[in-house]
């Protein structure tokens, strides 16, 4: 069989040309620019072949993915690598190894939104509002909340070094990580008729724990409730909805509105007559905590007491990708029953009262907010 070299070469050129045209059109569509493909090639060549030190292809590709989601300019939308994705799943399950601290980001950088009671960070003396300037000697100036959380978590028994800035002073902490199974619900009777429930996070198991402890307090004579959501960073909307069924009569809990304007209304379905209620909040109360507080305030079901909340009024979902990675992306904003959007604003309490510095929330001896809640419920 005789091959015509020119015919073979021409066929190859047609296939290659067709491939280039398809790629060019694809990147034109993806980038919105006719020059999308060459722009990518120039950037990739500069990073992989010209940059002063060699960089792996995997690092460059991960950077592209993180940059893609980061370009949304919304702090809660991030591409999660394998470690970050694992950390996220552990956080919502309520079980992980770390120091028991929830992080956030403000105009000064990375900071502690809330410190979980009786966990390593709490015992070491880290306080809500502390800015974390270094983790294991590495600056936090250019890392995301998810990156920082992943670095702080690790094997139980290992030590993480944190450099903290507090009121202009730099402090150093060496904290031993522990396996943390979060007791997300704690309760007790404050008086013969007033119960107290503290929720530290709305995790997968929180609703069941809340139900058990709520019914136990009822059996002890609870007729009114102090619900403590201070330093609660939020969690699962499904858990929030279940808990609302114990403290709110039938009605709107929250409305979630997506980019297309579609509205999903979540409702509470509790007793027709609500139990007298005071909800404690502070700057560390975010997301699901604000859903509860906002609904109670709008529907006049109780009194919100404390300081202005964090102001996270958005809903995220996680899309798993291959290789145990994923994308956490903000899909909607939530509206309180009176159609308030609190993202970036927070909820202003009905009764504003701050804790003195150095007082741990839920300490009934020194906690003036709990004392004020009791005063409100007993009048």
Q: Where do the protein language model's features map onto the residues?
A:
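Generic structural signal for buried aliphatic residues
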Residues: 46, 132-133, 160, 342
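Terminal targeting/pro-maturation regions of precursor/exported proteins
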Residues: 2-76
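Conserved functional hotspot residues or short segments at active or partner-binding sites
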Residues: 71, 342, 361-364, 368-379
